[in-house]
Design a protein with these regions (language model features):
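Bacterial N-terminal signal peptides
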Residues: 4-14
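Periplasmic c-type cytochrome electron-transfer domains
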Residues: 21-462
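Sec/Tat signal peptide C-region and signal peptidase I cleavage site
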Residues: 15-20
Length: 462
């Protein structure tokens, strides 16, 4: 029997068991196509399934866990959503028209086929619809919207985005893809070394998720605190590779337990020049972002050696970085320079940007090298110059109103990737190979077949 079938059976069994259970064992291995993922409760206790995170606090049956599932790396995967549709005929609480359907207008969810069509983006790409209006003082206007599902309103834009994982949140420098739940930029974001602002941001996110996604009244302060406390206990990472074995074996430091002791503060190892002052220690940038598998560099195991080679590629493969809004257009930075994956993924052994630095690398551009034909196209016009631009997601610009922020989103944490395909904020990369192909095309970087296989093995081991 194929591994994928076995994994699906295990996941189905887990869904049944957890529906009747009050907790998950700490460090329970959960299968994915590359091996097994584990979540570690930093309190070294079972992971409770009875708190506010798992309770339906709204009116549509949803809880936080509807879109942040342990088996999917605490987000949702396309395959996981498809399984839930199959098991419930599309009646699981994740399938709700307020934001789970492609549009909330002119849809028919009275039949299984109707629901399959209405929720096609959620099923195929794991996407939730995010509806936002322009800030009153926006530097641009919406000239037109071409949405294949309806929702063509120019005053309320519908974007389609992947839910971010509700684990490893202690490492965040920005909350949400567009930073809309983060402290306003007029104040220092999540100050070093105090995480109080992060906790406040997560509390606000929990409130907005309950009133929005769950269509409920604002949760009580006690419920919000319970959700945030729960989220902050979770550390998730790939723990076992089906070829290389345990990822903390042979002096390697993979897996979630080691991750729990990883040092982090906002600005740690920031890749911007020291003159920007983003790293409060003033330390120079270290391009060796990951050292999890240094001990495997000379391993006699071909699988372990491959993972170690992939780590080296991530840390050192030269990439010409140009045309990236948020980097190349920043005063004091060159229009083009040679960097690495770590230029944008600089947080040690975590892999996101350690400061709040939304970027536009081209994922939302209409000429993206990946298939984005399923996304709407927004034509935006600069109010001052008359310049127009087309994008599939205005990103951060819908929060700040700034023309320069169009298309910018944050880079996500890279741990637990194997359990949460598809990738990028719009789900346009179905596989990690698609991610690599995007970078090959967008940044004109060449990977040999061996380098691609090595890099994928490494990313799957995070």
């Amino acid at each position: 029997m194929k591994l994928g079938i076995i994994a699906a059976m295990i996941v189905m069994r887990l869904l049944i068991v957890t529906a009747r259970s009050q907790s998950l064992p700490n460090l329970l291995p959960l299968p994915n196509s590359s091996g097994w993922l584990e979540t570690y409760n930093v309190n070294n206790a079972p992971i409770s399934l009875t708190g506010a995170f798992f309770q339906s606090l709204g009116t549509n049956g949803r809880s936080c866990a509807s879109c942040h599932v342990p088996t999917d790396g605490w987000t949702v995967s396309a395959s996981g959503v498809q399984l839930r549709f199959l098991l419930t005929q599309g009646l699981d609480p994740i399938f709700r028209t307020n934001d789970g359907s492609n549009c909330d207008q002119n849809i028919d969810t009275s039949s299984v086929q109707g629901r399959r069509q209405a929720y096609s983006l959620l099923l195929q790409r794991g996407l939730i619809r995010v509806a936002l209006s322009l800030p009153a003082d926006a530097e641009f206007s919406v000239q037109s919207v071409s949405n294949p599902y309806g929702c063509n309103d120019t005053s309320m834009l519908s974007m389609y985005r992947r839910p971010l994982p509700a684990t490893n949140l202690a490492f965040l420098s920005t909350v949400m893809w567009d930073g809309r739940e983060s402290t306003p930029p007029s104040t220092q974001k999540i100050t070093y070394p105090d995480t109080g602002q992060l906790l406040g941001d997560l509390a606000h996110q929990a409130m907005d998720a309950t009133t929005g996604h769950a269509q409920g009244a604002p949760p009580t302060p006690a419920q919000i605190q319970d959700i945030v406390n729960f989220e902050m206990t979770l550390r998730t990472a790939q723990a076992i590779d089906k070829r290389a074995g345990f990822l903390n074996d042979g002096q390697a430091t993979g897996g979630p337990v080691k991750l729990a002791s990883q040092k982090f503060f906002v600005g740690i190892n920031d890749s911007f020049p020291a003159s920007f002052g983003f790293n409060p220690t003033g330390a120079a940038f270290n391009p060796n972002i990951f050292d999890l598998f240094d001990a495997w560099k000379n391993s006699q195991s071909s699988a372990r050696a491959r993972i170690a080679r992939g780590q080296t590629i991530f840390n050192s493969k030269p990439i010409t970085i140009s045309g990236v809004a948020g980097i190349n257009d920043v005063t004091g930075l060159p229009a083009s320079f040679t960097g690495t994956c770590g230029t944008c993924h600089d947080s040690p052994n975590v892999g996101h940007h350690s400061v709040s630095a939304p970027l536009n690398i081209g994922v939302a551009d209409v000429d993206s090298p990946l298939d984005i034909s399923y996304l709407p196209v927004f034509t935006l016009v600069n109010n001052a110059t008359g310049e127009t631009v087309q994008t599939t997601d205005p990103g951060r610009a819908l929060i700040t109103g700034k023309w320069a922020d169009i298309g910018k989103v944050k880079g996500p944490i890279l741990r637990g990737l194997a359990s949460r395909a598809p990738y990028f904020h719009n789900g346009s990369a179905a596989t990690l190979m698609d991610v690599i192909r995007f970078y090959e095309s967008r940044f004109n970087v060449s990977f040999s077949p061996k380098e691609k296989a090595d890099l994928i093995a490494f990313l799957n081991s995070l």
